C-alpha cells in the first residue's frame, strides 16, 4: 500500500509540475504580449522627434583652445545646423526574467530604428540603430498595504548602441557608442 501511495504522489507531483509549467508558459507569453502592447499604446515611439545638437555640442567646445579657436566658428555654425531624426522605430520581442525569491524581474526591450542625420553642407544620410533597453521592476507594498509595481534601474544593453551606415558588410562604417 505504501508503494502504491508513493507512486500515486509521485505521479500527481509530475502531473502538477508539468501542468504548472504549461500554465506558466501561457501566462508568461500573455504577459509579454500585454507588456509589448502596453509599451506600444504608451505612444512613446511617435514622440521621438528631430533632435538638434546645438546645445550639447556647443557646450563641448566651450573650454577647448588651440586649433579649435581657429576652426571653431565655422565648425560651430555647422553644428548648429545638424539634426537627427528618428524614423521607423520598432519594438522587437520583449523578454522578461524573474527572480521569485526577491520579488523582482528584469524586462528587456529590444529597440531598432533608422536615424536620418542632416547637415547643412552635406546630403542627409541614414544609419540603422539597434539597442536593448533593460528595466528592473519589483513588487513593493505601498502605504495602504497593497502591492504595486515599482521601476528600478533602467539601462542600455550591452551598455552600447550599435549604429551602422551604408552596406552592412563594411565594418569600417559601424559605430559603437558606449554609455
Swiss-Prot record:
Signal peptide annotation: 1-20
Record-linked InterPro entries: BPI_fold-superfamily_member, Lipid-bd_serum_glycop_N
One Gene Ontology term of the molecular function aspect: lipid binding
GO process terms (BP): surfactant homeostasis
This protein's record includes keyword Signal: yes
Location(s) in or outside the cell: Secreted
Any GO CC annotation of this UniProt entry: extracellular region
Keyword Signal: yes
Domain of life of the organism encoding this protein: Eukaryota
Coiled-coil annotated residue ranges, if any: none
Gene3D superfamilies: Bactericidal permeability-increasing protein, domain 1
Tissues/organs with expression: Expressed in breast cancer and salivary gland.
Alphabetical keyword list: Secreted, Signal
Sequence similarity: Belongs to the BPI/LBP/Plunc superfamily. Plunc family.
Protein name stated in the entry: Putative BPIFA4P protein
Organism: Homo sapiens (Human)
Amino acid at each position: 500500500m505504501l508503494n502504491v501511495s508513493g507512486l500515486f504522489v509521485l505521479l500527481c507531483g509530475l502531473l502538477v509540475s508539468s501542468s504548472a509549467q504549461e500554465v506558466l508558459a501561457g501566462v508568461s507569453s500573455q504577459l509579454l504580449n500585454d507588456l509589448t502592447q502596453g509599451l506600444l499604446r504608451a505612444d512613446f515611439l511617435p514622440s521621438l522627434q528631430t533632435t538638434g545638437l546645438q546645445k550639447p555640442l556647443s557646450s563641448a567646445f566651450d573650454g577647448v583652445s588651440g586649433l579649435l579657436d581657429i576652426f571653431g566658428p565655422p565648425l560651430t555654425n555647422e553644428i548648429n545646423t545638424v539634426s537627427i531624426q528618428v524614423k521607423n522605430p520598432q519594438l522587437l520581442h520583449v523578454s522578461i526574467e524573474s527572480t521569485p525569491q526577491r520579488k523582482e524581474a528584469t524586462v528587456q526591450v529590444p529597440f531598432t530604428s533608422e536615424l536620418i542625420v542632416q547637415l547643412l553642407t552635406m546630403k542627409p544620410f541614414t544609419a540603422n540603430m539597434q539597442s536593448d533597453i533593460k528595466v528592473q521592476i519589483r513588487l513593493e507594498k505601498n502605504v495602504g498595504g497593497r502591492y504595486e509595481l515599482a521601476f528600478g534601474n533602467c539601462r542600455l544593453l550591452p551598455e552600447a548602441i550599435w549604429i551602422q551606415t551604408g552596406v552592412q558588410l563594411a565594418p569600417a562604417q559601424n559605430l559603437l557608442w558606449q554609455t
